[in-house]
From Swiss-Prot:
A GO term, aspect molecular function: glycine-tRNA ligase activity
Species of origin: Lactococcus lactis subsp. lactis (strain IL1403)
The entry's keywords: Aminoacyl-tRNA synthetase, ATP-binding, Cytoplasm, Ligase, Nucleotide-binding, Protein biosynthesis
First-listed, main subcellular location of the protein, grouped into a coarse class: cytoplasm
Protein name per UniProt: Glycine--tRNA ligase beta subunit
């Protein structure tokens, strides 16, 4: 067994592309080796902004030799009327390097036996350039030189070593060899690698920490040490740490500062300037207050670090000056004046202005407020917030720092005298901002956030701007996913189908399918039974909270003994009712068997309390009360009686069973085998 090193040296890769690129390289190499039957133990990944590298450990010296049988023509066409081999069979055997007489008849077909020799690892790996590297795909490409080759960034060098031997191949004008390169500034020289196994130890000697996880741990340790030394609190934000890790090859953390006068600007603005714009880690004092300092990481050593500190401080001060200016100037503006100007700001060319969007949102929010059971005071807050909630889009601060939309709206609203509920709703209506993002905390904010998302989806669908495939330029999938999470968190129960029917539009069925797909996705991230999820999202009314709850409740009982017979009895009822053309009213006087009366009594009893029962209680009632009564009914009663009135009455009884259970799920979609 041997080890193989492949390193692709590049111009600096954008930070957000480094990790997916190295993952793709490893995956493509794994696929390539398996397709070529070249066994290996594992693939180790290395990455920096300037290189993507893997080491394949435990690589076999050659691919496995195999004997295989290749299926050929049918025996029916193998020979002509005179018993001679047909052209079809001759062509097949020739293509397999055999004669017709060498073929084997198995059943109705002829097969050719074929022996495939093993191929040396070196020969297989010489194809890595064309079969692995050249086939990589990226969201962003670059083209260089006089060719049509595209890659994430121009390739500068390639290392290809099988133990101590170069596995040469050419890619454009680059020939794979044993020479890597050190840090661009600290060791800008060729680094000769004698052996593939020297990579992880040799590169740090040239100021390149190629192990991304080790480099990240080093960055974390340095930042925490500086924070401890200065008695600060610091959070190693996951995304920021990942980004910083992917812009450096040799990290050195340092401390910078800014004038405390800027602390008069809201902390969110300062943090945005540092964290989002400059990739700095903000720090807090022991009381949890933002300190006039930051920690950053340079791509290099500590030499002349004081100049680096000064340069970073200068850049930050320029941003903070702008922030302070906007903070002061925006406070001179009036909310009503800004709201009036929104009439001239386009929401979308096909949809209209932001003012029109806000008006529709206000109407939707009023109806949601009723569903949510808000007080009269809360309803007034919903109405007020819906009238003004986009005003901060026209402030200088949001114009400069668009990440602060909503955040600044809340602050400016409070300064203008709006109450806490209205102000918080302005900030919360953007929530959640990501798949797992924070949800609104207030009732008013939840209603406004949901209403804003509903109008966005309705509006874009109504003008035909519907997401397709992976294309979703208006983030409607994210909006719907956020809507689902808000509705579930707030435990709102309403039929979305009936709700959106109150508003204009012709694509409501498409919208419901779109929402249903998002519910399915959310559920399948946590549950492994597709059939249970499918059953829950196909309940008889489009109650999102009910769908989510039902899926988890049913899934929680799937291993219990009564689960299978209960589902089967309910499913049998559903299937019989589906076949019926006309459902009559139940007439208890037509009952002929005790089992009919018993099932009827169970149904009536459950109907009286069904609306108010939690999902867990509903399912227990189905399993322990309804299903046994259904089973006895089927054992004692011939549903398809000769007397049509009796038959119709029994179908009507089963239809009530279906109506009851389908509120929770379509149980006929659950697999019990």
């Amino acid at each position: 067994m041997t080890n193989y090193l492949l390193e692709i040296g590049l111009e600096e890769i954008p930070a957000h592309l480094v990790t997916p690129s190295i993952n793709q390289l490893a995956e493509r190499m794994e696929t390539f080796l398996k397709e070529n039957r070249l066994e290996f133990d594992k693939i180790i990944k290395f990455s920096t902004p300037r290189r993507l590298a893997i080491i394949v450990e435990g690589l076999a010296e050659a691919s496995e030799a195999i004997d295989e049988e290749v299926k050929g023509p049918s025996a029916k066409i193998a020979k002509d009327a005179q018993g001679n081999w047909s052209k079809a069979i001759q062509g097949f055997s020739r293509g397999q390097g055999a004669t017709p007489d060498d073929l084997i008849l198995k059943g109705d077909y002829y097969y050719a036996k074929k022996h495939i020799d093993g191929v040396k690892a070196e020969e297989i790996l010489s194809k890595v350039g064309d079969e692995v590297i050249a086939k990589m795909t990226f969201s962003t490409y670059m083209k260089w030189g006089n060719n049509d080759f595209l890659f994430v960034r121009p390739i500068q060098w390639i290392v290809s070593l099988l133990e101590d031997k170069v596995v040469a191949f050419d890619l454009l004008d680059v020939t794979a060899n044993r020479f890597s390169r050190g840090h661009r500034f600290l060791a800008n020289v060729e680094v000769e690698l004698k052996n593939a196994n020297d990579y992880a130890s040799k590169m740090p000697e040239n100021f390149v920490l190629v192990d991304a996880e080790h480099r990240k741990a080093e960055i974390s340790a340095q930042i925490l040490a500086l924070a401890s030394e200065n008695k600060w609190q610091v959070t190693l934000h996951k995304d920021l740490l990942e980004e910083v890790n992917n812009i450096v090859e040799y990290p050195t953390a340092f401390v910078g500062s800014f004038d405390p006068k800027y602390l008069s600007v809201p902390a969110e603005v300062l943090v945005t300037s540092m964290r989002d714009n400059q990739r700095y880690f903000e720090v807090y004092n022991q009381e949890g207050q933002l300190a006039p300092n930051f920690i950053s990481v340079r791509n290099g050593n500590a030499e002349n670090i004081e100049n680096v500190v000064l340069g970073n401080e200068k850049v930050l001060v320029a941003r903070l000056e702008d922030a302070e200016f906007f903070w002061k100037e925006d406070q001179k503006l009036k909310i009503e004046d800004l709201v009036a100007k929104l009439a001239k700001v386009t929401f979308h060319a096909k949809i209209g202005s932001i003012t029109e969007h806000m008006a529709r949102t206000k109407e939707i929010a009023a109806k949601l407020a009723d569903i949510a059971g808000l007080t009269d005071e809360e309803k007034r807050d919903v109405a007020r917030s819906a009238e003004i909630y986009k005003f901060d889009l026209l402030t200088g601060m949001v114009g400069e720092f668009d990440e602060l939309q909503g955040v600044m709206g809340e602050k400016y609203a409070l300064l203008a005298g709006e109450n806490a509920n209205v102000s918080a709703a302005i900030r919360e209506h953007y929530m959640p901002t990501s798949a797992e993002g924070e949800l609104p905390e207030t009732k008013v904010g939840s209603v406004l956030a949901a209403a804003d998302k509903i109008d966005s989806v309705l509006s874009f669908f109504n003008v035909g701007l519907i997401p397709s495939g992976s294309n979703d330029p208006y983030a409607l999938r994210r909006a719907v996913q956020g809507l689902i999470r808000i509705i579930e968190k707030m435990n709102w129960h309403f039929d979305l189908s009936l709700f959106i029917d109150q508003f204009e539009g012709e694509n409501h069925l498409e919208i419901l399918d779109f929402v249903k797909a998002r519910i399915q996705k959310l559920l399948l991230e946590k549950l492994d039974r597709h059939d249970i999820v499918e059953a829950a999202i196909n309940s008889s009314n489009f109650d999102i909270t009910n769908m989510m709850e039902s899926a988890f409740v049913i899934d929680g009982h799937k291993l219990h003994e009564p689960f299978k017979p209960a589902i089967e009895n309910v499913s049998r009822s559903i299937n019989l009712v589906k076949k019926a053309k006309d459902i009559k009213e139940i007439n208890p006087t037509l009952f002929e068997e005790d089992a009919e009366e018993a099932l009827y009594n169970v149904v009536i009893s459950l109907q009286n309390q069904w609306t108010y029962m939690p999902g867990e209680e509903k399912f227990r009632a189905i399993v322990h009360s309804l299903a046994p009564a259904i089973e006895t009914f089927f054992e004692s009663v011939m549903v398809m009686a000769e007397d049509l009135s009796v038959r119709d009455n029994r179908i009507a009884l089963l239809s009530e069973v279906v109506a009851l259970t389908s509120v929770m799920a379509d149980f006929s979609l659950i697999n019990t085998k």
